[in-house]
């Protein structure tokens, strides 16, 4: 009997609000982000799931989101594993820049390519493919074996690190994943088959509210 995998993107951060490229920089949640995480946690509590383990990145916005969710589901002391492999995509030289300022410096078309292409990284940073190249092996070696043993696993991470996972789980093409936006604080509940493919997927909230 295989288990359950729940993916949640962190709530809105200070830098999301300021329209800055964040990447591996480490801002905390806004008041709205706290509310989003609490809403996601309440949805999971209503769903009735109890987790065996949680995973998150080493960045505070994901860890704070996880803490709020675990409080809501009544598991504040759940075993939690933090790993850099789940960090957001590294935006390199764009990190900390306002997105409008970046467009003014490099041009709208170039910035769009860096943000939305699959395999073109910004200067000093990672492409979505690069991000997946560290996220997917970590999933295969650390997270998936637990799910296949029947455990219920929660992952609180970031837009691009989670898109890398969803791309494979949902069998999306490159074009499909580039069009994919994950709303902040909205849990995605995957039931996996014994062969690690997806038996079912349920979204506990509105995915149209992506930042």
UniProtKB/Swiss-Prot annotation:
Pfam families, sorted: His_Phos_1
Catalytic activity: (2R)-2-phosphoglycerate = (2R)-3-phosphoglycerate
PROSITE patterns (alphabetical): PG_MUTASE (PS00175)
EC class of the enzyme, as a word: isomerase
GO biological process, one term: glycolytic process
Source organism, top-level taxon: Bacteria
Sequence similarity: Belongs to the phosphoglycerate mutase family. BPG-dependent PGAM subfamily.
Primary role: Catalyzes the interconversion of 2-phosphoglycerate and 3-phosphoglycerate.
Assembly and binders: Homodimer.
PANTHER family to which the protein is assigned, alphabetical: PHOSPHOGLYCERATE MUTASE (PTHR11931)
Record's protein name: 2,3-bisphosphoglycerate-dependent phosphoglycerate mutase
């Amino acid at each position: 009997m295989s288990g359950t995998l729940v993916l949640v993107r962190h709530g809105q951060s200070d830098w999301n609000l300021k329209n800055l490229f964040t990447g591996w920089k480490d801002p905390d949640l806004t008041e709205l982000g706290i509310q989003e995480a609490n809403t996601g946690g309440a949805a999971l509590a209503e769903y009735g799931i109890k987790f065996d383990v949680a995973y998150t990145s080493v960045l505070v916005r994901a860890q704070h989101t996880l803490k709020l969710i675990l409080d809501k589901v009544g598991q504040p002391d759940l075993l939690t594993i933090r790993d850099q492999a789940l960090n957001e995509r590294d935006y390199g030289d764009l990190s900390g820049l306002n997105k409008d300022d970046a467009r003014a410096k490099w041009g709208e078309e170039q910035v769009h390519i860096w943000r939305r292409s699959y395999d073109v990284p910004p200067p000093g940073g990672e492409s979505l493919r690069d991000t997946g190249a560290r996220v997917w092996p970590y999933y295969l070696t650390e997270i998936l074996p637990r799910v296949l043993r029947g455990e219920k696993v929660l992952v609180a991470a970031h837009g691009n690190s989670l898109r890398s996972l969803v791309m494979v789980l949902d069998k999306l093409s490159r074009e499909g994943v580039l069009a994919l936006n994950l709303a902040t604080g909205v849990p995605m509940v995957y039931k996996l088959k014994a062969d690690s493919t997806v038996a079912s997927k349920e979204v506990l909230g509105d995915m149209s509210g992506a930042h």
